[in-house]
C-alpha cells in the first residue's frame, strides 16, 4: 500500500512537471524579448528621445517649439555638462521640465547620458560649425548698447521696436519672454533657428559676425522687455 502511494505521488509530480513545461512552450506565449521593459530599463535612444524630447524639439530634432537639436552650431557650443544640467534639472520658469529622477522626472542618469550621446551621434554637424562662436553662457550685458546691436542686426526682420516685421514675429511679446530664459535667448542669437530662417551669430550681416559682447548686450536688451513678475495679493 505504501509503495503504491509513493508511485502515485511520483507519477503526479512527473505529470505536473510535464504540464508546467508544456505551458512554457505554448504557441503564442510571449518570449522574454516580448515582455515590456520597465521605463527605467529603456536604453534605446530613439525610444527615449521620442517619448521625452520630440514633443518640444521635433521628431527629427527640428521644427519643434523649442530649439532644434539638429542645429550644428548649438551642438558645437554646448558641452555635455551643460546639456546634462538642462535635461536633468530643467530650466525654472520656462517650459523645460526636469527629467532626472532626483528632480522629479523619470529618467536615470544612464538614460540622460544615452540621450546626450544619441543627440550628438545622430545630428552632429561639421566639426568647425561653431568655430569662433561666442561662448554658450555669459553673464552681464548692457541693454543700452543692446539697443544699437538690435538696430544693426535684428530690426530688418523683427521691426524697429521688436514687435514684428515683414519677415519675422515679435521678440518682445510679454508671453514669449515670460516663457524663455536669458540663456535661451542667448542660444538663439548665437545658434539661430535655421529651420525657421533665423540666422546665426555670423550670418545676419555678411562679414560682420556678432562679438561675445554684442551677443550679451542684445540679450540684455531683450531681457529688459520682459515684464516684471506680478506681486502676490496680500489678502
What residues fall within each predicted segment?
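Bacterial N-terminal signal peptides that target proteins for export
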Residues: 2-13
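C-terminal motif of bacterial Sec signal peptides marking the signal peptidase cleavage site
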Residues: 19-22
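Electrostatic cytochrome c docking/interface patches
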Residues: 24-47, 121-149, 232-235
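Gly/Gly-Pro-rich "capping" loops immediately C-terminal to redox-active cysteine motifs
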Residues: 35, 39-42, 46, 58-88, ...
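Short, solvent-exposed loop/helix junctions and linker helices
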Residues: 39-43, 47-50, 77, 105-109, ...
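The canonical Cys-X-X-Cys-His
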Residues: 45, 49-59, 115, 146-160, ...
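Axial heme c-ligation environment in periplasmic c-type cytochrome domains
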Residues: 64-72, 89-122, 129-140, 165-170, ...
Amino acid at each position: 500500500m505504501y509503495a503504491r502511494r509513493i508511485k502515485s505521488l511520483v507519477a503526479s509530480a512527473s505529470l505536473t512537471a510535464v504540464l508546467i513545461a508544456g505551458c512554457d512552450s505554448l504557441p503564442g506565449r510571449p518570449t522574454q524579448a516580448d515582455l515590456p521593459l520597465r521605463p527605467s530599463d529603456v536604453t534605446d535612444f530613439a525610444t527615449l528621445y521620442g517619448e521625452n524630447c520630440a514633443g518640444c524639439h521635433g521628431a527629427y530634432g527640428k521644427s519643434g517649439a523649442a530649439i532644434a537639436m539638429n542645429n550644428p552650431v548649438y551642438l558645437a557650443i554646448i558641452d555635455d555638462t551643460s546639456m546634462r544640467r538642462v535635461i536633468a534639472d530643467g530650466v525654472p520658469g520656462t517650459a523645460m521640465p526636469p527629467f532626472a529622477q532626483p528632480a522629479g522626472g523619470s529618467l536615470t542618469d544612464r538614460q540622460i547620458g544615452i540621450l546626450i550621446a544619441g543627440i550628438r551621434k545622430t545630428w552632429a554637424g561639421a566639426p568647425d560649425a561653431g568655430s569662433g562662436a561666442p561662448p554658450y553662457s555669459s553673464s552681464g550685458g548692457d541693454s543700452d548698447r543692446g539697443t544699437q546691436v538690435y538696430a544693426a542686426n535684428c530690426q530688418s526682420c523683427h521691426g524697429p521696436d521688436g514687435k514684428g516685421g515683414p519677415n519675422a514675429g515679435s521678440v518682445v511679446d510679454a508671453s514669449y519672454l515670460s516663457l524663455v530664459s536669458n540663456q535661451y535667448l542667448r542660444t538663439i542669437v548665437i545658434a539661430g533657428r535655421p529651420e525657421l530662417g533665423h540666422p546665426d551669430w555670423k550670418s545676419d550681416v555678411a562679414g560682420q559676425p556678432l562679438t561675445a559682447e554684442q551677443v550679451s548686450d542684445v540679450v540684455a536688451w531683450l531681457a529688459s522687455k520682459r515684464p516684471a513678475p506680478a506681486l502676490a495679493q496680500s489678502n
